[in-house]
Amino acid sequence: MMARRDPKSWAKRLVRAQTLQKQRRAPVGPSAPPPDEEDPRLKCKNCGAFGHTARSTRCPMKCWKAALVPATLGKKEGKENLKPWKPRGEANPGPLNKDKGEKEERPRQQDPQRKALLHMFSGKPPEKPLPNGKGSTESSDHLRVASGPMPVHTTSKRPRVDPVLADRSAAEMSGRGSVLASLSPLRKASLSSSSSLGPKERQTGAAADIPQPAVRHQGREPLLVVKPTHSRPEGGCREVPQAASKTHGLLQAARPQAQDKRPAVTSQPCPPAATHSLGLGSNLSFGPGAKRPAQAPIQACLNFPKKPRLGPFQIPESAIQGGELGAPENLQPPPAATELGPSTSPQMGRRTPAQVPSIDRQPPHSTPCLPTAQACTMSHHSAASHDGAQPLRVLFRRLENGRWSSSLLAAPSFHSPEKPGAFLAQSPHVSEKSEAPCVRVPPSVLYEDLQVSSSSEDSDSDLE
């Protein structure tokens, strides 16, 4: 009986039984786990939900098809917009637009407070509205146009300046421009700079352009008092660039006949040592000379700097002391000094002796002053030699102690025997003529010394 059974049919039956078992084991659909299997203390790392772990088959990340859609908790009628607005077009205006149109058509109602303010500012009594409504529109227009003071609108146009103030400002700017233009080293000033100034600045230009020494003295600073002429002198003016001061042009009146008119005096300043470079200052014109000029010793007051400087200069001193100022001493010049060169007697400006202090001030340091320079009388031959258009040259010498001395070289009109020692004695000051041998100095060394001196003077003026 057993041998008669077909093995193929047996195999078919076995396969059917296995498939039925597999179908029974496999879940038909997502079944909710029993409540005892959920543990709220557990948290899944995959989905972040509580009640199961990442290994559990209940995680929706593993069986995504079995994930349930979360249901809403409930509707909040208070916050939900139950009647949403539909988009309105121009053809179908909304109620807000209708309300605006009605308000514009209606006459504007004025409250009593607005009427009171209108009456206060405008000064006009409020108009009574007419029953037909025409007066209400006029009153609303009256509110829109205020009758009070209008605000001032600023424009880009510049306001007009008073011509008198404009002239003063132009004169001040021209004066500043001339001072700034003279601050460049090794530059000669032109005669037009003095003519561009106004009459007031022309009278006080000599006193204003002279720098004050860095050493502070008691009282007012000494000033070079001259009377500048408004026109060019007859004999022709010369420009002489000076070192160590802002006055870089001495315009000499070289007419010999003009010396016997009236006496005139001038006081020499106490010059600052090496404060400015060549070509600094303003043009000063001098008047005719005196009959009998008296000689006064001029002591060079050095302006000793706070720090050692290179290239100090001395202001040329050619002063003739008269009876108006009262010189401390009246000495006759030696014959060697009278033959050094011509010197003009500048005319005294409108100054009083109280405004011009004494010139014999001693420096605060215990350093001996340089030897005094005697002013020279003017000869007719030497004055006539300046009538031509001959250029004037300045000779600079470097001394052993590192200082500089300057001397004015003019065309020789007459030769006089001169000793070398006399020139060395006069080397701190500028003599108008010198026959001493010329010592050539490289321009770079001179320019560096002048730059150091000018920068130190600027620092001293800023500190003061």
From Swiss-Prot:
Gene name tied to this protein: FAM90A8
Entry similarity comment: Belongs to the FAM90 family.
The name this protein goes by in its record: Protein FAM90A8
TM region positions: none
Organism: Homo sapiens (Human)
Biased amino acid composition, Basic and acidic residues: 74-89, 97-114
Comp. bias (Low complexity): 180-197
Region (Disordered) location: 1-42, 69-389, 415-437
Domain of life: Eukaryota
UniProt cross-references to Pfam families, sorted A to Z: zf-CCHC_6
